[in-house]
Amino acid sequence: MLPNTGKLAGCTVFITGASRGIGKAIALKAAKDGANIVIAAKTTQKHPKLLGTIYTAAEEIEAAGGTALPCVVDVRDEQQINSAVEKAVEKFGGIDILVNNASAISLTNTLDTPTKRVDLMMNVNTRGTYLTSKACIPFLKKSKVGHILNLSPPLNLNPLWFKQHCAYTIAKYGMSMCVLGMAEEFRGEIAVNALWPRTAIHTAAMDMLGGSGVENQCRKVDIIADAAYSIFKRPKSFTGNFIIDENILKEEGIKNFDVYAIAPGHPLLPDFFLDEHPDAVMEEKESNDSVPEVKEEKLQLQEESQLQKQPQLQEQPQLQEKPQLQEKPQLQEQPQLQEKPQLQEQPQQREQPQLQQQPRPRQQPQPFVQSMLPQKPHFGAVEETFRIVKDSLSDEVVRATQAVYQFELSGEDGGTWFLDLKSKGGKVGHGEPSDRADVVMSMATDDFVKMFSGKLKPTMAFMSGKLKIKGNIALAIKLEKLMTQMNSRL
């Protein structure tokens, strides 16, 4: 890990969403230098599952060697922001560094995102970052250090990053646009940069929302804290950059990233917005049996100041550096995938006259080509899947799940099916359930069969647009766990 140098001794660091997760990790790293930390977050009462409040964070910061000032701040409330800034200046004499970490997330498409969720994401992510920066800038300009760091991604305009969660992407990119604008506006006075993880980051909320074992696919929050510390050490001329945690730490001389991993050697989950070919990333994750970081964390609306890559689901170091898992150039450069039309046209056959005079069976694709072509389920595959599911049900499964699922399947052998895990012993069948479904899942029949047989991860299907979910996401997650138990039979 990156050692502390004492560079931040006496500096005042204002961090939003610092009661837990990434925000608190950055605070503790700075505290080891003897920095003053303003904990600007909402949580004042203990949460039954998400540990940490502004007061418990303050105790940890003091124990690490820093001086803490806990402030109740909802970044949607300009008055609370200004009040916290005033208290910080009154107690510490100024502000040297601002970290815009608080964020809200909902991985839902346009029609499934209620206006209140859109407003929340825009107000917390973009507006909150803008207002907090605006309030701190007069004091940052007076500082010899003068840094603003936003936890936001590079501006990758590939439409595939917008398609499934347009509102979230716009809101998150708003934070990144603040970096673009303010870096130029205050060039020479304040350094303004963005930091984003290459992989999923593990926090307490990840365990709650991602299920057992998800932490093995993540890195610790320490990698973000070390990367942020590296940025703070740099001069004001280092500005307008969109930094990936792993890259800047390599510049610091870090070669072995094992210390940041939760599980050494386990495949890691790449984060959003980094790959120019998202479909290739999805294939890579699925091929390595990885469940995306976005997972359930990002399927639910929560503040990243609480989730901040605690699950979501938001954000991701490793014990063994596996660049091949993160970059997988071979997935992006397979000409077979990009040139399928040649396989369909087969020009070499059209140029042979004897084919027209003496018809013969069509040449079969080679095994590799066959694996690249879409496979249709055989007749009755859906019905057979439900039969096996039915045989796997028990009162114990029903008690553990307590949900009714409806499947809207398109294509061959499609239609409406249901899985009732509320009734005694459980029920399955064709048509709509007798009771209203808690979760409705829409997808193609072949993808449905792959999903229940373990060949397609539900989260992967959701991220790639193959699966659409309406209803209770937490219950959808329970179904994924049930699928895992049944995969061997399917």
UniProtKB/Swiss-Prot annotation:
The UniProt entry annotates the active site at: 168
Q: Which residues bind NADP(+)?
A: 17-23, 42, 74, 172
Keyword NADP appears in the UniProt entry? yes
List of residues that carry N6-acetyllysine: 116
What's this protein's name? Hydroxysteroid dehydrogenase-like protein 2
The record's principal subcellular location, in a coarse class, is other
Annotated region Disordered: the residues are 282-370
Q: Which residues carry this modification: N6-(2-hydroxyisobutyryl)lysine?
A: 42
Molecular functions per Gene Ontology: oxidoreductase activity
SCP2 domain location is 380-487
Q: Where is the composition biased (Low complexity)?
A: 302-367
- Similarity section: Belongs to the short-chain dehydrogenases/reductases (SDR) family.
Q: In which tissues is it expressed?
A: Widely expressed.
- Outline what the protein does: Has apparently no steroid dehydrogenase activity. Controls bile acid (BA) and lipid metabolism in response to nutritional cues.
Its BP terms in the Gene Ontology are: cholesterol homeostasis
